[in-house]
Amino acid sequence: DRWVAEAHVLRAYFYMELLKWDGPVPIEKEPYGLDYDYSTLSRPTFEDCARFIVDDCEIALQSSNLPWRLTTLNEKIRMTKGIAMAIRSEASLFAASTYNNGGKDLWEWAYTINKDCLEQLKANGYELYTKCADTEKYYNNAYMEYFTLNNYIGTDPSDKETIWQSTEGYWPDPYTNPLYDVIGAPVLGNAQLTIVPSQELVDAYDMLATGKPVLDLSKPYNDEKHLSPNYNPNSGYDPANPYKGRDPRFQATIFYNNSPVLLGKEPAVVETYVGGNSEIRTSGNTNTRTGYYWRKRMVNGNCKAAGVAGYDGRFRFYRLGKIYLNAAEAAIE
């Protein structure tokens, strides 16, 4: 019974990935014969695929042997009811969007499903990670700490928010090729830089005190190149102190000029100004072009500069925070 339920969840997951990447794909419940005429296949609607995915998840959820979460590491690659709920939430929301709904109003359906998913996940032990355990290491920023954790499996894990995450690191050996080596700031001793946050991403983080956007969303910029921001006068934003008072997710995600960081156990700051320890440059493969570096999922203190290696946070496929956002979007619509 459990194996069959997991097969339904896995089929739902892979169909959802195909749907997101390639659009609607033929719905086939039986294997093809060797002489099958593939020219007879037809592409269904997005809604058809989404409902098929939701149905698979709901079949799996009926199993009394499929657990809500994994409790032992030797089952870390297996499926759960939590994963089924997350896929069910995503499939219905995507189908209801204007881009995919084919002119039909599916928001009531999506809202009903997402409300149920959120309620059942919360009732079965999932909760947001809101309290920082190591306040000194992560500056009392629970969001920063959360994405460095790799302990969501167990009967009472410290991370109860993660529904499903990668079992592997970003490289074959994360101890020799951790995140800071490929996307970190030079002050950490990075070997190369593969991505950098844009100014537009930085501008997207609201002000914490007011909850208002930094820019006037009716016209965020005064020019096509986005070099002249059009500030929201009611946000409380101070252009002379641009990083103060922002949504805490900003500090948890991005290194900016004067960001605090640990080199091993020694406190330091990231300097992105010309001449700084992680200066902005227009050439080379180690320094930012935008004045920002990626921080999310990096364990604070791990860095080549201090000779401290270790595993970073794994990529989350699904987490409760995302289900909250899905439910909120469906409710608003």
Locate predicted features.
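Flexible, polar/acidic helix-loop-strand segments at domain edges
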Residues: 220-319
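Intrinsically disordered regions, especially transient/low-confidence alpha-helical propensity segments
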Residues: 65, 104-106, 140-143, 161, ...
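Active-site-proximal region of nucleotide-activated glycan assembly enzymes
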Residues: 328
